[in-house]
């Protein structure tokens, strides 16, 4: 018998439907339930063959536990190692290299820093920050949002430099991005399951988040040609990022889909939010993915970061303790040979040139000056 564990937060209808579907289809050979976790021993058996993670991004204890389970060969949807390493600004930088359009985006230094970080710790930061150059590049309206956030948390629309400063001053220690606002003709949110199955959903981001009014069931919302491009871009992004469950949002302007957000490894799937049609689709698609992954031949993972970051369905470990090697079967040849080849292969590097624009002295600097309490922040001085 194989066991599937569901790790959840506040959501109810999606995990309950998923557990019901898996148990009905599994007929006792595959069972699903909610995981219960307490103190975890470092050498504890995982207890589950596959885990669907919906909440570890908000609970570090869960994330650490999932990494431990992955080490023992448990399939985790989504991969906790990559999820921990990923961020949205990296994704925005990656997408154009994959042929996917994105809005102009700038990563900003933090407004504040934790206690103990002084101006001496920040000597690599430019001072003053060229705010005018940044907004000239991005334009208005634009969106100030965390470089690794989700769920529309701490996202602000700004229409002027003054509004930007006001919102930026409230961001504290969050690292933020400023992103071009696309005056879209159409907007879609797309489920992607198993890096293959795609459901395009008409979506209105102007409606209240989780209100049940954002998702619109309209199969003919996009032209066939545009729908094909969107599906292609979704699969390209999710395959490159390694996410088996994700959503990708596109703001479409003049026939061009701009990828706005594509780091959503625990996407909303609640019945009241997405509606019955999309709820049933995502539940069915994830159920199919579970049985597909459980049916794939898998070996114990190699105990190396790169192998855990990008596991393959069939993986034979090549780096393990002598005791474990005596108790498990090691298949010599291809794995060891490929590792040796990889170790001796030259590392290619791509050097990209950066076009420097003439700097316009900022009206509001972002370098940090020490406060009396030991914290640092952006001063509000102005230059003339």
Predicted segments, located by residue:
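A long amphipathic alpha-helix within ATP-dependent nucleotide-binding catalytic cores
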Residues: 210-258, 281-284, 288-298, 303-319
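Short, solvent-exposed loop/turn segments at secondary-structure junctions
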Residues: 11-12, 57-58, 83, 149-150, ...
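Beta-strand scaffold of nucleotide-dependent catalytic cores
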Residues: 167, 177-179, 187-204, 258-263
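A short, polar/charged loop-to-alpha-helix boundary motif
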Residues: 207-215, 269-276
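A short beta-strand motif that forms the metal-chelation/ATP-contact edge
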Residues: 48-51, 190-192, 256-271
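Conserved N-proximal alpha/beta basic substrate-recognition cap immediately N-terminal to
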Residues: 9-121
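Active-site nucleotide/adenylate-binding loops and adjacent lid/helix of ATP-dependent enzymes
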Residues: 2-8, 70-73, 81-188, 216-220, ...
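Intrinsically disordered, polybasic Lys/Arg-rich low-complexity tracts
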Residues: 336-384
